[in-house]
Amino acid sequence: MSRVGNRLLSIPSGVNVEVEKSLVKITGKLGTLSVPFDSKKLSVLNKDSMVIVKRANDEKETKMLHGTTNANINNALIGVNSGHTKKLKIVGVGYKAAVNGNKINLNLGYSHPIDLEIPAGLNVTCPQATEVVITGADKAVVGQFAAVIRSKRPPEPYKGKGVAYSNEVIIRKVGKTAEGSKK
């Protein structure tokens, strides 16, 4: 039994939900998001300020789609109402970030700076030179852009230098020591 799929999703005040044939349009103060679903295997109902996702049968694929669709609709409801946020921290001597217009400029120890285009619908800020905050309505786009920034210099296990999520735990390794080596 899919516990995620059977959750009833409450619609926050100020959010409008429209169910079309195979698309759920969710509109709120931060924009409009559309969540597609398979109308042959699932049905989405909008009743009494609640969104209900039901499945047609108990096949394995249908159960998987049931939970995924329910989670995607829930992410969209939260996104258009309060938004999603990812925070990145930059660790390393001379490593820094700055936002210039619709681009983010990263200096990560390479011989050249890295410029990345900020996707539409995202708000990227740098409260400090070693901190990046990404906010937006679409959770997938926020997470994907944070992953792209992190991939430019992932944290290394010896000194922890690189770009990491603010809540990420970096497993550290012990480096080579002069005392421990045998000659």
UniProtKB/Swiss-Prot annotation:
Protein name, entry field: Large ribosomal subunit protein uL6
Organism name: Malacoplasma penetrans (strain HF-2) (Mycoplasma penetrans)
GO MF term list: rRNA binding; structural constituent of ribosome
Assembly: Part of the 50S ribosomal subunit.
Disulfide bond positions: none
Short name of any one Pfam family annotated for the protein: Ribosomal_L6
Superkingdom to which the source organism belongs: Bacteria
Main function: This protein binds to the 23S rRNA, and is important in its secondary structure. It is located near the subunit interface in the base of the L7/L12 stalk, and near the tRNA binding site of the peptidyltransferase center.
GO CC annotation terms, alphabetical: cytosolic large ribosomal subunit
NCBIfam families: L6_bact
Alphabetized InterPro entries for the sequence: Ribosomal_uL6-like (IPR000702), Ribosomal_uL6-like_a/b-dom_sf (IPR036789), Ribosomal_uL6_a/b-dom (IPR020040), Ribosomal_uL6_bac-type (IPR019906), Ribosomal_uL6_CS (IPR002358)
Keyword annotations from UniProtKB, A to Z: Ribonucleoprotein, Ribosomal protein, RNA-binding, rRNA-binding
GO terms for biological process, alphabetical: cytoplasmic translation
Similarity remark: Belongs to the universal ribosomal protein uL6 family.
Organism ancestry: Bacteria, Bacillati, Mycoplasmatota, Mycoplasmoidales, Mycoplasmoidaceae
Residue ranges of coiled coil: none
PROSITE patterns associated with the record: RIBOSOMAL_L6_1
